A protein has these predicted regions:
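Short C-terminal tail/terminal secondary-structure segment
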Residues: 2-10, 148, 227, 238-251
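Conserved glycine-rich cofactor-binding loop
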Residues: 25-26
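Conserved NAD(P)H cofactor-binding loop of Rossmann-fold oxidoreductase domains
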Residues: 94-99, 247
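Substrate-binding pocket helix/loop in short-chain dehydrogenase/reductase
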Residues: 100-113, 207
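Active-site helix of classical SDR
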Residues: 124, 159, 167
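Residue(s) in the substrate-gating loop at a strand-loop-helix junction
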Residues: 143
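Short, small/polar-rich loop/turn modules that mediate ligand/substrate recognition or access, typified
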Residues: 175, 180, 237-239
Length: 251
């Protein structure tokens, strides 16, 4: 699906820019990658498995994007991926997992946190030098669960709360390098991860009844926020956690 938000900005706003979308092979990450590609950027996406890369290869929205397999738990793999990119203007962290119902197990909890939070820190640290050279920016993916708890997903909730605080901390730490660090905080977005909830009429209705804009969000809605945060229009914006949730948090 084309992203209508791309037309909000000057044509080819991101021409000459290299964007790395970690976890950009599907869902919100793919929506963000497709939007930047449509806006003229060179985009590289990563996935954790060969199957992820196959999905990306079959997505027409990602046509023209390069890709590689990276497990964000592997510091060496993360650094090799970033070292292979000559120049980098924007790092976008979308890699994440959610294991509903099993995250009360400490081992599962630790795995989720290692991917969602520690993985975000690994990519930020590995990208710092290249982003310093370009005076670029980082966009992390927080969540509405950065703001409230989730009894079935304590690992996911803790990791996304951590991403929020990490974003604020790195915004301060990296400011002297000319690097801005922000995050999007998606609400209920229609992706494969939320497919079970979308298919359950009673649960979907409960979500929509609390959402003032009364619809499920789409990956391109989150992409619109990312296009702004990476743009010159946001040159004085750093340390922000931007909800993209149709008003869910304020209702």
């Amino acid at each position: 699906m084309s992203n209508p938000h791309v037309n909000t900005y000057a044509p080819n706003l991101y021409a000459g820019h290299q964007i790395l979308v970690v976890g950009g092979t599907s869902g919100i990450g793919a929506g963000i990658a497709a939007a930047f590609r449509s806006a003229g950027a060179a985009v590289h996406v990563t996935g954790a498995t060969a199957a992820d890369l196959q999905v990306a290869g079959e997505d027409p929205g990602l046509a023209g994007c390069s890709s590689s397999m990276v497990d964000v738990r592997d510091d060496t793999a993360v650094r090799e991926c970033i070292d292979a990119i000559a120049h980098l203007h924007t790092l976008i962290n979308c890699a994440g997992v959610l294991k509903r119902g099993s995250e009360l197990d400490p081992a599962v909890f630790a795995e989720v946190v290692d991917i969602n939070l520690n993985g975000t820190m690994r990519t930020c640290a590995a990208s710092r030098e290249k982003l310093r050279a370009s005076k670029g920016s980082i966009i992390n993916t927080a969540s509405m669960l950065s703001f409230f708890g989730g009894s079935l997903v304590p690992g996911y909730s803790a990791s996304k709360g951590g991403v929020s605080q990490l974003t604020k901390s790195l915004a301060i730490a990296y400011a002297a390098d000319g690097i801005r660090v922000n995050a999007v905080a998606p609400g209920w977005i229609a992706t494969r991860m939320t497919g079970v909830l979308q298919a359950d009429a009673s649960r979907s209705d409960a979500i929509l009844s609390r959402t003032p804009l009364a619809r499920w969000g789409r990956p391109e809605d989150v992409a619109g926020a990312a296009l702004f945060l990476a743009s010159p229009a946001a040159s004085f914006v750093t340390g922000v956690i931007l909800p993209v949730d149709g008003g869910y948090l304020v209702s």
